[in-house]
Amino acid sequence: MRAQRGLILLLLLLAVFCSTAVSLKCYNCLDPVSSCKINTTCSPNLDSCLYAVAGRQVYQQCWKLSDCNSNYIMSRLDVAGIQSKCCQWDLCNKNLDGLEEPNNAETSSLRKTALLGTSVLVAILKFCF
């Protein structure tokens, strides 16, 4: 019975940590007139944010990192001569210039939370089994 409760607790913790780990937020605008302020939470299969420019057309949206190459993006968006970047942290696709990973407290605290969560899960596994 004790092992069963431990397993249930472990599964609940995994669900919480896994759901927060894949919740990437990206700007989501097609050719914004001014700075894009609309953001969305990406689905788990879309693991990066795309910022692409073709002439005056701007694309900001969730994207699959493995599909982040110019030829694929041009064919998918049906445009030519595109400049694009993909990134993998929240709201990183504001513009082409700002696609460097931030070194701030928010990013650091997310990594610390993930490390703490992993440590807690290991402790629970050792305690219950």
Curated annotation (Swiss-Prot):
Prosequence residues removed at maturation: 105-129
> Keywords on this record?
Cell membrane, Disulfide bond, Glycoprotein, GPI-anchor, Lipoprotein, Membrane, Secreted, Signal
State which tissues express it: Widely expressed in the kidneys, brain, lungs, spleen and testis Testis-specific.
Q: What GO terms describe the biological role, i.e. biological process, of this protein?
A: negative regulation of activation of membrane attack complex; negative regulation of complement activation
UPAR/Ly6 domain residues are: 24-107
Q: What does this protein do?
A: Potent inhibitor of the complement membrane attack complex (MAC) action, which protects self-cells from damage during complement activation. Acts by binding to the beta-haipins of C8 (C8A and C8B) components of the assembling MAC, forming an intermolecular beta-sheet that prevents incorporation of the multiple copies of C9 required for complete formation of the osmolytic pore.
Provide the membrane topology annotation.
Lipid-anchor; GPI-anchor
Subunit relationships: Interacts with T-cell surface antigen CD2.
Q: Which residues are glycosylated?
A: N39
Lipidated residues (GPI-anchor amidated asparagine): N104
Q: Mind telling me which residue stretches traverse the membrane in this protein? A: none
Which Gene Ontology cellular-component terms appear in the entry?
cell surface; external side of plasma membrane; plasma membrane
Name of this protein: CD59B glycoprotein
Q: How is it modified after translation?
A: N- and O-glycosylated.
Record's subcellular location = Cell membrane; Secreted
Q: Which residues form the signal peptide?
A: 1-23
Q: Which cysteines are joined by disulfide bonds?
A: C26-C49, C29-C36, C42-C62, C68-C86, C87-C92
What the entry lists under InterPro entries is as follows: CD59 (IPR056949), LY6_UPA_recep-like (IPR016054), Snake_toxin-like_sf (IPR045860)
Q: Identify one Pfam family in the record.
A: CD59
The highest taxon in the source lineage is Eukaryota
Which Gene3D superfamilies does the UniProt entry name for this protein? Answer: CD59 (2.10.60.10)
